[in-house]
UniProtKB/Swiss-Prot annotation:
Main location group: secreted
Keyword Amino-acid biosynthesis: no
Signal sequence coordinates: 1-20
Pro-piece positions: 21-44
PROSITE patterns: SPIDER_CSTX (PS60029)
UniProt subcellular location: Secreted
Superkingdom classification of source: Eukaryota
Organism: Lycosa singoriensis (Wolf spider)
Disulfide pattern: C48-C63, C55-C72, C62-C87, C74-C85
Protein name as catalogued: U3-lycotoxin-Ls1k
Length: 115
């Protein structure tokens, strides 16, 4: 009985040690993968297209506003056959940014009042 108990404790100890090493290996692999993704994103980043400028060359190049990224919107001007694309902020996002700004400002006042 003592031998079985000792063998069981040894087996559990070895199993926990090996699983801890495997988790460390997985954590290291996740960190390496995350760093490589960040490096790729930085290398991929280029100049963004400002609001109301032509974005037909790259429809995903619009700049970010305070909270949201602008959207490349395409349309046909009146009496024209050529499609025109510009970076614009959708109205619902514009209103959400205004509301967030007012909420932040109001939150600062409440914090100031109640210390």
């Amino acid at each position: 009985m003592k031998f079985e108990l000792l063998f069981g404790v040894l087996l559990v100890t070895l199993f926990s040690y090996s699983s801890a090493e495997m988790l460390d290996d997985f954590d290291q692999a996740d960190e390496d993968e995350l760093l490589s993704l960040i490096e790729k994103e930085e290398a991929r980043a280029k100049e963004c297209t400002p609001r109301f400028y032509d974005c037909s060359h790259d429809r995903h190049s619009c700049c970010r506003s305070e909270l949201f990224k602008d959207v490349c919107t395409c349309f046909y001007p009146e009496g024209g056959d050529n499609e025109v694309c510009t970076c614009q902020q959708p109205k619902h996002l514009k209103y959400m940014e205004k509301a967030a700004g007012k909420a932040k400002k109001f939150g600062g006042k409440i914090k100031k009042w109640f210390g």
